[in-house]
């Protein structure tokens, strides 16, 4: 019997500091989904809310940081009981604010993407990184000159592969 999923939409921010390290947050241990695991800041899009407004709101609620968004850099999927959540990941910049976590999270770290494997990641983020790695291995000869020096380049290269996977083409 095939499960009929309700689709949920979440947005996530890929925020890097001047060293190229990316902000990750540790979910509280009493969280319903991915308790105690690490993830990118962000959350659910409310009905009628734009991606940008939702992500700016979620990041502020979770971190007290005001951000400016750049581009969509990837997509991931999370299968929960009865809900299939699609996570749209956008790059952004911190504009102002002191990092102060809400009660949804109990820790944070600034970490290089290559070191994410040292953390117990939320399932959707772990899946996204695995797909990014696979896509970059098969597309090594593709070089985007515009982002070649950008620390977010590995994420940006994965957009097509992520979307294809969500659509079931890979």
Residue ranges of model-derived segments:
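Short aromatic/basic micro-patch
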Residues: 39, 66, 110
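A short coil-to-beta-strand element that immediately follows conserved catalytic motifs
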Residues: 65-74
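A generic structural micro-feature
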Residues: 3-7, 34-37, 82-86, 102-105
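Short, low-complexity, charge-dense intrinsically disordered segments
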Residues: 136-158, 164-170
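Conserved N-terminal beta-strand and adjoining loop/helix that marks the start
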Residues: 1-22, 75, 91
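Conserved Nudix-box catalytic region and its N-terminal flanking loop in Nudix hydrolases
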Residues: 21-61
